[in-house]
């Protein structure tokens, strides 16, 4: 009788232990860092989409996720500080835009903390992925491929007689350099010449606009974080000379650009959130190839 009782007690104890372990696993709370390079609508939409994508997969703020959100305000020094802090405090880091992704990757490399990036235009050029789209490190994410050819067709349809397109770009942003190169390669096919003006900081934009705008028929934006952050300045300068500005995504069109064949950043962020969920569930980020945005969304501002 005692042996049977002992066996029953042991069985119950094992069941309770297993139940407690399962409950502990289910109730695990993750600290996720969201490190955003700059304050503008494209990156804001990425951030919100990322949170939505995680929620779709069952990772909900206040239930099993705590978010730490910081913005570097396009300051490279602050970018490094945020990345290092999150590498220490977070279980996973979502890095928004190329400079922040590179900083987070470097900060998390030794610890092996996963980095999931988004709004990175060329992960291979940024050294975040190999030619197959993967990595030996714990990093993956999503790529905002600018539909350059579609944008050139759009500009031609709006401006049938235009010859020169102006592009402002930040010389330290590898994403902008990659996009500019693609514009230069394809422009001739549509009868355009690209006139580019490089800047170092947002403070350079007014003078760059004053020099560039008289030389061109219009401007087109890249997914350049500094330029997009100063879009109001660019639009003021261009409007004063009657030169249209074409955006690189829908929010820029809402804010005054004439039209765009650009990226839809909420959807891009949602995809990034779903990828982050895979990593939280045990996948090694480097084994997941980065995902590129699909095509572009044409939008037009009838008030411009």
Question: Where are the regions a protein language model picked out?
Answer:
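Short, low-complexity disordered leader/linker segments with a strong preference
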Residues: 1-30, 56, 88
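Extracytoplasmic "Venus flytrap"
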Residues: 31-57, 68-77, 172-174, 226-229, ...
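An alpha-beta-alpha
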Residues: 32, 50, 140-187, 289-304
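Short beta-strand elements in bilobed, periplasmic/extracellular small-molecule ligand-binding domains
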Residues: 58-79, 138-139, 186-202
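Beta-alpha junction/loop-to-helix N-cap segments that form part of ligand/metal-binding clefts
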Residues: 68-130, 224-239, 243-247
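Hydrophobic alpha-helical segments within soluble ligand-binding/sensing domains
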Residues: 122-164, 263-283
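Pocket-lining segment of extracytoplasmic ligand-binding domains
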Residues: 174-243, 249
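Flexible loop/turn connectors
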Residues: 251-303
